[in-house]
Amino acid sequence: MTSPDADSAGLAAYALALGDDALVLAQRCGEWITNAPQLEEDVALANIGLDLLGQARTLLTYAGEVDGQIDGQIDGKGRTEDDLAYLRDERSFTNVQLVELVNGDFAATMARLLAFSTYQLALYEELQHSADPTLAAIAGKAVKEVAYHRDHATSWVLRLGDGTELSHERMQAGLARAWPYVGELFDASWVAPGLIEQGVAVDVRALETGWRAYLDDVLAEATLEVPDVAQRPGGGRRGIHTEAMGYLLAEMQHIHRSHPGARW
């Protein structure tokens, strides 16, 4: 059910972008299965990936149900989650670039997870009060999941940052790798005019101060420094992605595209 005053095309695009964030990061988390440094961590990252995949499914399903423009075609109603996950090309995905970056080492993965989950938790805490009842319900369910994701990443950043000389160095390098992409998290220019004013979408610009305060506290406790690096121009919300995105989609979409219409 959509909110009566929301622009349908804008609402569909908003749900789709949030779903793409979750879907792409779920794919990256899944790449750690059988590769994590501990068996317990293998399970933890698999569960985080499954949480994100669940969020992606509900958001993509909702985007497909909303009348409007999705992927350049009028009337997106009736598109399934599978259609949106597997049958769009790279330029049609609108996730932030941060989530698509190649995992790197474990410290780099935890740095990205900390940055993104802190943002996502703040986003969902606000979105659960959305004027759109479906978005509010999706966010309300996801808040507890994402709080765990943030806590898990926080514990590892503290452990690695304030651990050995090598772990500290790796953690600092992981932060420097992710940091050029965090600015895009707080870009609200892509959201359809009116959705924020109607209370449907969250104005992410208002989340940045709290996000930075949390990250500053964690990094200080971990004896790490906030990276002094320039921000990338971004563009993921408009379909402009890093080189890594094409490879990720090729792997994720291969089976579905190779056997269209197959039933398992």
Give the residues covered by each predicted segment.
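Acidic/His metal-coordination segments adjacent to aromatic residues that form catalytic metal sites
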Residues: 1-14, 87-112, 163-164, 178-201
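Alpha-helical scaffold segments that form or flank carboxylate-/histidine-based iron centers
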Residues: 10-15, 36-55, 109, 134-146
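Extended, helix-rich structural scaffolds rather than catalytic motifs
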Residues: 169-264
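Helix-loop segments that flank and shape redox-cofactor active sites
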Residues: 25-47, 120-135
